[in-house]
Every structure is written in C-alpha cells, then in structure tokens.
C-alpha cells in the first residue's frame, strides 16, 4: 500500500479538480453595455449581467476616476437585464467609465467624450437589490466567461508534458554516460507519454481558442511554438526508428533529445515572453499573466491540485509503460528467437 499512496492521490486530485472545475458557478458580473460610448447629456444604457439577480429596487450609476454619476432611472427588465438613463455631466476626467449595477461592476465599459477637470457635484449612489452570495465561485472575466474552467484542464496538460520531457532529458543524459540501454528505454517511453499530453494540450487549446478568439487556430507565437515542439519530438521517434543498432540509436537519440528540450523551452517559455513578439496568451508578448485578477484564490484551490494530479497521472502512465517494457525485454532475453 505504501507504493500506491501517490497513485490514489493522483486519482483523487484529478477527479476532484475536474468535478469542481465543471460544477463551481461563476461570480455574478456585468458582461455587456450598449452603447459603449457616452458624451455629456442624457444617455440610455442597456446593461446585461451573468449569474445576476437584479431586483426591482436596483441602484445603478457610472463611475469615472472615482467620481460617481447616479442613474436618473433604472428599469429592471429581468434578473439579467437592466435599462438605465443617465444625465452625463461635462468634465469627466478619464476616457474610460465604469458601469455599476448593485454590487456588480464592469470596468472601462464606456468610452467617454468631453473630458475636463472633474465634475463639480457628485452624489452618493446607494446599493440595493437582491444579492446572490455564492460561497465558492470562479472569477467571471470578459472574453473568457465560462471557458475559464478550461484553465484547469489545458494548462495541466502542458505542465505534465514538461515534467515527462524533463524525465526524458535526465534519462538521455544518463544514457550518454552509460552503456545501460535501460536509460535509453526510459527516455523513449517518457517522450511517448509526454507527446500524449502535448496532443491533449493542443486539443484543449484549440477548443479554447475557438470559444474565445473565434478561430480553431491563430497565428499566435505560443500556439505555433507548441506545434513545432510536438513535431520536434515526433522527429525524435522517427530518428529512433531509422537506426537499427541499439547502442548507436541510444547515443544519437540522447544527443537529439537534449537539443529538443532546449528548443522546447525556447519555443514555449522564452520566445512568447519577448515584448517584441505579439501573443494572445496571458503572460506572453506583453500581455499580463494570470495573476490576482484572473487566477483568484477560489480558482487556485482547483487549479493547483489539477496540475499536481495530472502530473502524477502522467508519471504513473510512464512508470507503467516502463515496467511493461522491461518485462518484455526480460522475456525477449530469456526466449531469444
């Protein structure tokens, strides 16, 4: 049983994180405001919410650089739609104005015209209406919305792949310093399992791109780097199949594998983070990484166990394949043809 604890932990973490990632609701949020520009004078706005429960006495207002402008009238069409009219004063200080309805806010929802040094008279707008307080919710972010759940599936695939390719790198280095072909076997099998996670990462990434960016594949440096890395490791398998002599194959494959890992780090971790390179991925090409804004504490509670669980699953798959390969090798040695 002492050798099974981490395998049981892997299953529990993956199942628990997967169920939580799919079942935990998103926070209530404002997701759309129409129109998206305002100028001094009366303006009618239509505000759409998600997971909201707007009540008949709902309060609404605009906020610009800390100054509030209360809505003249608020009509609650339903729990997720509010129509409000606002007499926009001249002299707002910032180009972007937030829209607030009850306890929900959409930052930078309105482009503001007619800027000045600030409004002379400011009113305090009360907060009313029915409030749904989910005890455990995921952040509700523009563009991502429900697809933010995929973070707990997509990113763990890449972490698992990196760990497995790292195991392969260590095995290849050991293979160069030894004549023991078991190191070469370990490098080969860890690459094969790592490629499985690479493919799953590409699939989940493509699905996510379709839902958020509107295309199955975009000319994104990280997407292209991941695809090139997959081809590099597929070429590793082709190289192994083209060299029949075991010891020569082990040395050539080990040298190739070391360079492959260097290129993997370059394409996935270094190039996308250069400011001169445009990338849609968070944390790349000047885009902000998942931090306190996107990856809040509730999402971390699910995200980190998911990463650890999938890494352990990947290592488990690798050890199973390695044991089977060693048993097959022993049988072949005992029964030479």
Language model regions located:
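N-terminal membrane topogenic signal
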Residues: 1-11
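Hydrophobic alpha-helical membrane-insertion segments
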Residues: 13-21, 255-271
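Immunoglobulin-like IPT/TIG beta-sandwich domains and homologous Ig-like subdomains
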Residues: 33-109
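Hydrophobic cores of alpha-helical transmembrane segments in multi-pass inner/ER membrane proteins
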Residues: 158-171, 228-240, 301-319
């Amino acid at each position: 049983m002492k050798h099974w604890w981490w395998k049981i932990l892997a299953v529990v973490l993956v199942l628990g994180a997967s169920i939580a990632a799919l079942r935990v609701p998103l926070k209530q949020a404002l997701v759309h405001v129409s129109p998206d520009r305002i100028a001094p004078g009366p303006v009618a706005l239509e505000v759409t919410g998600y997971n909201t429960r707007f009540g008949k006495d709902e309060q609404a207002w605009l906020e610009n650089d800390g100054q509030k402008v209360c809505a003249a009238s608020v009509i609650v069409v339903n729990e997720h739609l509010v129509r409000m009219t606002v007499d926009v004063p001249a002299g707002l200080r910032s180009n972007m104005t937030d829209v607030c309805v009850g306890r929900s806010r959409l930052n930078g929802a309105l482009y503001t015209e007619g800027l000045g040094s600030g409004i002379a008279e400011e009113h305090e707008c009360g907060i009313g209406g029915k409030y749904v307080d989910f005890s455990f919710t995921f952040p509700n972010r523009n563009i991502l919305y429900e697809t933010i759940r995929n973070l707990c599936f997509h990113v763990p695939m890449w972490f698992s792949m990196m760990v497995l390719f790292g195991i392969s790198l260590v095995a290849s280095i050991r293979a160069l310093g030894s004549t023991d072909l078991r190191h070469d076997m370990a490098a080969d099998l860890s690459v094969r399992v790592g490629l499985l996670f690479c493919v799953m990462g590409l699939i989940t990434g493509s699905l996510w791109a379709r839902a958020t960016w509107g295309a199955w594949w975009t000319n994104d440096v990280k997407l292209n780097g991941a695809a090139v890395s997959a081809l590099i490791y597929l070429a590793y398998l082709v190289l192994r199949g083209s060299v029949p002599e075991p010891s020569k194959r082990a040395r050539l494959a080990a040298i190739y594998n070391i360079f492959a890992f260097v290129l993997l780090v370059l394409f996935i971790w270094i190039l996308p983070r250069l400011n001169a390179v445009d990338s849609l991925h968070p944390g790349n090409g000047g885009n902000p990484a998942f931090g306190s804004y996107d990856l809040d504490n509730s999402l971390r509670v699910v995200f980190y166990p998911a990463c650890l669980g999938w890494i352990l699953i990947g290592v488990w798959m690798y050890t199973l394949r390695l044991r089977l390969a060693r048993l097959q090798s022993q049988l072949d040695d005992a029964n030479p043809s």
